[in-house]
Amino acid sequence: LVKTREGRPIKIEPNNDASFNGATNARVQASVLSLYDGARMHSPMMDGAAASWAEALVKAQSLLTANSVVLTRTVISPALKTAISKLGLRHVSVDAVSQSNRADVYEALTGVRALPTIELAKARLVFAVGADFLGDWGGENLNGAYAAARKPGSDMLRHIQAESGLSISGANADVRIKAKVSEYESVLAHVYNKVANAAGVATVSAPALREDIKLSVEGVANELIAAGSGSLVLNGLNSASAEKLAAKTNELLASAAFNMSKLDFTATGSDSDFAALLEDIKSGAVTSVLTLDTNVLHFSTAMASLADKVSLVSIADRLDETASKAVVALPMSHYLEAWSDAAPVSGIYTVGQPTISPLFNSKSAVEIVNTLAGGSESAVDLIKASAASGSSSKSWNALLHDGFADIASEEVASGSIDMSGVAVSAPLKGLEFYTYTKAGMGAGNNANNPWTYELPDPVTRLSWDNYVVMSAADAVAFGVEVKAQSNGSMNGTTINITVDGTTLENVPVWIQPGQTQGSIGLALGYGRTEAGKVGNNVGVNANELLAPAVNYAEATVVASEVEHGFASVQLAHTMMGRKIVNEINLPTFLSGNAKEWNEKPTFESYKGPLTSFEANLWDDQDHETSHMWNMSIDLNSCTGCGACVVACSLENNVPVVGKDEVRRHRDMHWLRIDRYYSSDMTNEVAEEEGVGAIEKYAKMEVPSESPSV
């Protein structure tokens, strides 16, 4: 739902009436600002010069021949799929963050290329392995369902996370297990084997687990068996074997939350189809490519190296790294300017209508593709035709009013996961390198939007950069330091990373509590060169080291001489023993004796201990007749995702100050979500070990290697 004022979109909210877990995240809220981005294409372009639509379309049609290919990211619009099919060309979809191998598993099982949906409300125990389901993993936004399931009570959701780098999901977990990315398959295999033994079915061969996580993983398996159909196992690795292990475990447990009859179509790109396209370009079998809303030359170095072998026609919102290399570039309207439709999951159909007239000389993607195919229909007529072809009984006006319609789900074949092809990879012994996405930036589609840069990462509390996350132990081994400066800013060491002979130089390093030793990660979406004045040359392109189809690789690291300045909004990372936030376990909470764990603080005075109200030096606000404003945040419900921070900036036109001013702690966000780690040093430990006050407080400032958050 989009709120408009005087013909302008100003706020986006989820449509809670729709039978879909959708919600708004930070990037959705920030997308309103992208509407006004001056770096968007103002008109069609031919050979780098402005052209009319008539000229550009004729030229584009002349380039699209029988040996052309349409290249897109995952398309969930039925109308756009129909328009693409009218072109009569081979269609390849590839995603910057690939889930291709996972989708392969379910395509082989059901005959439909899609992923299962997750019904978190039906789970009582979730075990996620590398799946940041409160961040960017999956097509559904599960934050709302998670918040509802985490209300304290006898049936409160228990959450266990196994992962390499500390994610939003890991920070919210009850139990967190540190595992390298290359160990994810082993972790899933050992859990599966335990469940399989209990069910009396065949197990799989798997490498031994590290001794420091072996008992934890066995304990997880026992909990899953005890929870039965209330269990849920999630896999975040783009691996067919890993996905089969997770899916089969859910099958054996009869998981009610793992729904393979309602499918998720938001990540159906095919790495194998894309690899075949690259081979055809090399051989000359493909001479031109129509790219649609995909910046493939940024995230695929393989495609970038072949760009001069094909004629590109690009439909994009700006002259990005791909469109700038195109013979013809056709400007695509922002989604808030365009008619559109979508079928993100089976059983639901949605429509979008313009909230503002196009600011530039652009057209909707469906209208452009339809015109290239020889059609003359307007965008609204194409969407009307698409809606009419569905199985909904709603009228067009009712569909527009509601924004969605429930439709008949596509019939899918049912069956059991075939485990015969499962091969569990041995973990890397050396240093592993992996990529991940941030809540604000994602894969970089909004890389010229300053709100996505200025939003502090929920875990690291850094803005404006990407950086390698590294454990404290690895930092010592590689000579890496991060130090506070006299003005309160943070500076740190940079490193040169080499993977398969390719080196990224002077990459900043952030020492991250909770990071698994022997594993380093780098966020995607940065290192842009043709995003616009905000996004150009910010950070480094992680895809230069790792293609989207690759989960991890062995790396070598050498510290460099260049120092990097971080834009950190939080310098104190522990509470240093202060009881700012009360935390207790669930059984204690359910005991009902709140006085034992929620004692009201008192302050010493000459009159003796006083409550905060009694010690107040000023008269209390008159809450009966005066203005009053307050807000209480349920810390069990808040995941720290940062969506509200950007939403507040959107609603209140909060200015962006830039990296240099953030380093001076002059950021102007109206909302602040601080993140605190536990420390190994506590008042009780200090008393037991006879540690003095100065040493105690110094050690309290140091987060644990595996902290609670």
Regions found by a protein language model. Name each.
Residues 162-167, 315-321:
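Short, polar loop motifs at secondary-structure junctions
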Residues 175-281, 389-396:
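Active-site phosphate/pyrophosphate-binding segments
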Residues 318-352, 668, 673:
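Flexible glycine/proline-rich, aromatic-decorated loop/lid segments
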Residues 389-462:
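Long, low-complexity segments enriched in small/aliphatic residues
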Residues 201, 357-411, 660:
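N-terminal leader/propeptide and maturation segments of large enzyme subunits in energy/redox metabolism
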Residues 1-211, 462-466, 473-477, 482-709:
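N-terminal export/assembly segments and adjacent metallocofactor-ligating motifs
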Residues 69-71, 126-130, 160, 232-234, ...:
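Structural motif
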Residues 136-156, 300-314, 348-351:
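A short, gly/pro- and small-residue-rich
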